[in-house]
């Protein structure tokens, strides 16, 4: 459990530092810095709940499927905004049980183009860029990633899904989680 808290602290400690002034940043990175600063300082608070990961049955043996944990329980916190174009942008930090029932911390940035279906309903498509750590990949050394991200939302609740690609016997996982704006 101590390892879990160390991993989570690794991801959470840099987050408040993003609220610094962006003037000293190179011009090519200043826009990203300013957006992160805006999300951190002006964004609403989010509660994330994880709960399901589906392993593609065509890529694993039935014995291997039975060994996997597909109830990826966990949660986290984040901050997000709907920008001047109506698109969603957010920062998040979560921890959940991975396929081997080990705790996986993750922290990152998400972006989605949002299509509105009425006043309260929306669909989104975009991506997430993140840093994570897994016991079965590089012995918990944090590593970056980028994944597609789709969503369906109603009022303050949004359901997200991403697909982790892979080969025969690894990856190929549909991961679903939710976000509640408060």
Swiss-Prot record:
Family matches, as InterPro entries: LipidA_acyl_PagP, OMP/PagP_b-brl
Gene Ontology terms for molecular function: O-palmitoyltransferase activity
Bilayer topology annotation: Lipid-anchor
Residue positions of covalent lipid attachment, annotated as N-palmitoyl cysteine: 22
Enzyme class, first EC level, given as a word: transferase
Domain of life: Bacteria
Compartments in which it is found: Cell outer membrane
Family assignment from sequence similarity: Belongs to the lipid A palmitoyltransferase family.
Described purpose of this protein according to its UniProt entry: Transfers a fatty acid residue from the sn-1 position of a phospholipid to the N-linked hydroxyfatty acid chain on the proximal unit of lipid A or its precursors.
Subunit structure: Homodimer.
Protein name: Lipid A acyltransferase PagP
Source organism of this protein record: Bordetella pertussis (strain Tohama I / ATCC BAA-589 / NCTC 13251)
């Amino acid at each position: 459990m101590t390892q879990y808290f160390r991993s989570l602290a690794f991801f959470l400690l840099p987050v408040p530092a993003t609220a610094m002034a962006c003037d000293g940043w190179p011009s090519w990175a200043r826009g990203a810095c300013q957006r992160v600063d805006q999300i951190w300082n002006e964004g609403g608070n989010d509660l994330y709940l994880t709960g399901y990961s589906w392993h593609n049955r065509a890529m694993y043996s039935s014995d291997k499927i039975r060994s996997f944990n597909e109830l990826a329980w966990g949660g986290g916190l984040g901050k997000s905004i709907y920008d001047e174009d109506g698109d969603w942008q957010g920062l998040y930090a979560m921890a959940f049980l991975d396929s081997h029932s080990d705790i996986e911390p993750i922290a990152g940035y998400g972006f989605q183009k949002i299509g509105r279906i009425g006043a309260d309903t929306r669909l989104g498509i975009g991506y997430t860029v993140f840093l994570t750590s897994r016991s079965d990949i590089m012995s918990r050394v944090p590593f970056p990633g980028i994944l597609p991200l789709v969503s369906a939302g109603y009022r303050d609740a949004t359901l997200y899904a991403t697909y982790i690609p892979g080969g025969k016997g690894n990856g190929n996982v549909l991961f679903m989680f939710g976000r509640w704006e408060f």
